[in-house]
Amino acid sequence: MAYPFELGFQDATSPIMEELLHFHDHTLMIVFLISSLVLYIISLMLTTKLTHTSTMDAQEVETIWTILPAIILILIALPSLRVLYMMDEINDPSLTVKTMGHQWYWSYEYTDYEDLNFDSYMIPTSELKPGELRLLEVDNRVVLPMELPIRMLISSEDVLHSWAVPSLGLKTDAIPGRLNQATLTSTRPGLYYGQCSEICGSNHSFMPIVLEMVPLKHFENWSSSML
């Protein structure tokens, strides 16, 4: 989860988020090197007294500054496309959960079970227990098995919402009349927090998401108790 004054991303909990972090570091280094080079050239231009007024054209220089940016863009685009296709790939999910956004709460339906569905509301600050997080706790957590591919079907009953869990690398729009899908796989157990990430009205900040990733045996016991 996030911490106060955190400057980086949350710890990756899924293979997709790990790939996103690697791509971020790769792209950030390229941007840093380009910015440093530009600042160095600007500082030289401002401080040097040397001039060159006899140059009418420079084919070699023009060739270099055309080819070099193209190579840099390719070095950014190829890993970006790889991560993009990984995020859209869904192979034989073990479980499917349908998520519906409402003003201002989420409802969940486990489609592999006949009557396993519930609404998830934020717990008001006045009802929080010691150690619970303000504006992030819910009355019904989404319990899911870890280390298994899970398909999330995401839509909305009213306005545009967005279902996002940063530590899993997930952010999918919930659009009325349209069913979007995303895949998540958690590599370790724990509680993972998210929030609606699309402004959806006056209580937009009060519809958090809490995923509880547990071993498969614990999930089976939980699902049996809910039916």
From Swiss-Prot:
Cofactor note: Binds a dinuclear copper A center per subunit.
Keywords: Copper, Electron transport, Magnesium, Membrane, Metal-binding, Mitochondrion, Mitochondrion inner membrane, Respiratory chain, Translocase, Transmembrane, Transmembrane helix, Transport
Subcellular location: Mitochondrion inner membrane
CDD domains: CcO_II_C
GO CC list: mitochondrial inner membrane; respiratory chain complex IV
GO molecular function term, any single one: copper ion binding
UniProt GO BP: ATP synthesis coupled electron transport
PROSITE patterns: COX2, COX2_CUA, COX2_TM
Mitochondrial intermembrane side: 1-14, 88-227
Enzyme class at the top of the EC tree: translocase
UniProt binding sites for Cu cation A2: 196, 198, 200, 204
Topological type in the membrane: Multi-pass membrane protein
InterPro entries reported for this sequence: CcO_II (IPR045187), CcO_II-like_C (IPR002429), CcO_II_C (IPR034210), Copper_CuA (IPR001505), Cupredoxin (IPR008972), Cyt_c_oxidase_su2 (IPR014222), Cyt_c_oxidase_su2_TM_dom (IPR011759), Cyt_c_oxidase_su2_TM_sf (IPR036257)
UniProt cross-references to Gene3D superfamilies, sorted A to Z: 1.10.287.90, Cupredoxins - blue copper proteins
Protein residues bound to Cu cation A1: 161, 196, 200, 207
UniProt catalytic activity: 4 Fe(II)-[cytochrome c] + O2 + 8 H(+)(in) = 4 Fe(III)-[cytochrome c] + 2 H2O + 4 H(+)(out)
EC number annotated for this UniProt entry: 7.1.1.9
Topological domain spans for side Mitochondrial matrix: 46-59
TM segment ranges: 15-45, 60-87
Binding positions (Mg(2+)): 198
Entry's family note: Belongs to the cytochrome c oxidase subunit 2 family.
Designated name of the protein: Cytochrome c oxidase subunit 2
Species of provenance: Sciurus carolinensis (Eastern gray squirrel)
